[in-house]
Amino acid sequence: MIKKILIVDDSPVSIKIMKSCIPKDKGYELFDAADGRIGVDLFKQIRPELTFMDLTMPVMNGFEALEEIIKLDASAMVVIATADIQVRAIARAHDLGAFSVIKKPPTKENVAAAIAEVENELAGRG
């Protein structure tokens, strides 16, 4: 069951949009980080069940942050949220351990679908 969701994105506008797409009635605790380094540090502290990660960020990009998070927790559920939907970028994200990829800007529908997929995966793990 998802309780905590971490959003890692260098754009305050993108974070605001993502937060607006996450259902309010589920009681999720939302956290955000402005770059990959802060995101990894926050992940260590709060251990969210779901992380939405941008790819293009300063300090530490999303690929590097994803790699660090998967080293910390191989079963971490990281959904990449990016405008870069090139096949190569998506393949690299999956190779590094991303659970799935959604296109930015996010919509309530694709965020809800991503959350449902993660919930199903977590339920299947028991």
Show the residue positions of the predicted features:
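Alpha4 helix (beta4-alpha4-beta5 surface) of REC/receiver domains from two-component response regulators
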Residues: 64, 85-100
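Receiver (REC) domain active-site loop signature in two-component systems and cognate sites
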Residues: 57
